[in-house]
């Protein structure tokens, strides 16, 4: 994710 939200972490690698 390009924006750090509460739902999604900053790392999209996983």
Swiss-Prot record:
Keywords: Neurotoxin, Secreted, Toxin. The keyword Lipid biosynthesis does not apply. GO terms for molecular function: toxin activity. One of its GO terms (cellular component) is extracellular region. It is found in: Secreted. Expressed by the venom gland. Its main location: secreted. The keyword Secreted applies. Belongs to the scolopendra toxin 5 family. This is Scolopendra 5928.03 Da toxin. It comes from Scolopendra angulata (Barbados giant red centipede). The lineage of its organism: Eukaryota, Metazoa, Ecdysozoa, Arthropoda, Myriapoda.
């Amino acid at each position: 994710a390009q924006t750090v939200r509460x739902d999604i972490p900053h790392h999209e690698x996983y």
